[in-house]
């Protein structure tokens, strides 16, 4: 990136105008002078000059009756009412003095503001020069017919022009009038427009295809549709909107159409088999997996926690909760009452549940879709019977008893007895 250094303070700037503005702070140069009459202030920066000239314009708009400090000659109050030219000449003489300087404060402020906004050039413009230029701009510019034709001929020399010189001259022939400007286009303009559009129409532009997707054209629809053809219902199943279109009559590659378009968009269905089941087969399946699902068998010793009252190995009376094959893709939810993970001897809920012969389902095995075996009548528990639990692999831990006398230092059961395999006990 190019840098600009100040020769006085060695300050570096990235833009040259910033360097020039900074150097003026060292030299004290003020190149921007206020061009408002009777104001000789100078400024270092252009934005400061513009801000200053705006104050002159604001004061002139607020108090327009105040005039500048120049030789001002007011027009006499007595003016003939019928002579308007004398009044206009008096206004001009009021705005300008004998030496040609502007005496109207508003006009002088506007001209000074335009000078402040103007870019610096080699030739400085005075307020009188700016006033002369503004008068030239206000004059209406009227071109003759020859100048208009010459400009059209220059434009027509461009090779990118689509119209010929004669057509352009014919377009410029009508004179602008209020009636012609609002009239509709003439016949020659329509002919020229048609000539311009003819090369576009001559190209190989395909015509509009009337076979757009509608109810009358089911071949162009992306959803399956039923049709009755010769007393037989046909289900139209297009692969996609693009593939379901009519195949072309000719093949560019030379291959037969049966090889190129080997898909068939229509599947015939006998009328007797059209029901809800067949519709589920032919319609798109919302589930990506197949409809038939076979669940594997999970043994109880595969890491799933079991209750002490349930045998570890599966018995012959094991009844699965779900069938091996589902009739549909959606799994059926079995509403089974939640069962506790253990059954106490005095629990009437467990006895009643077992007496009904229903399948027990623990809460921790519900997410795996497993069912527990039915408990037979031989294992029923009642409050009046003695508790005879099923032999389990989980050993009962002895309870810690408090010492019988204060002289004993330890309890009756130690850590060795907690982790030692106790012999099996039998209950009479």
Swiss-Prot record:
The entry's keywords: DNA-binding, Metal-binding, Nucleus, Repeat, Transcription, Transcription regulation, Zinc, Zinc-finger
Induction remarks: By glucose starvation.
Signal peptide: none
Bias-annotated ranges (Basic and acidic residues): 71-92
InterPro entries: creA/MIG_C2H2-ZnF, Znf_C2H2_sf, Znf_C2H2_type
Region annotation Disordered: where it falls in the sequence: 67-103, 133-190
S-S bridge residues: none
UniProt function note: Involved in maintaining cell viability under glucose starvation conditions. May have a role in regulating genes involved in gluconeogenesis.
Name assigned to this protein: Zinc finger protein rsv1
Gene: rsv1
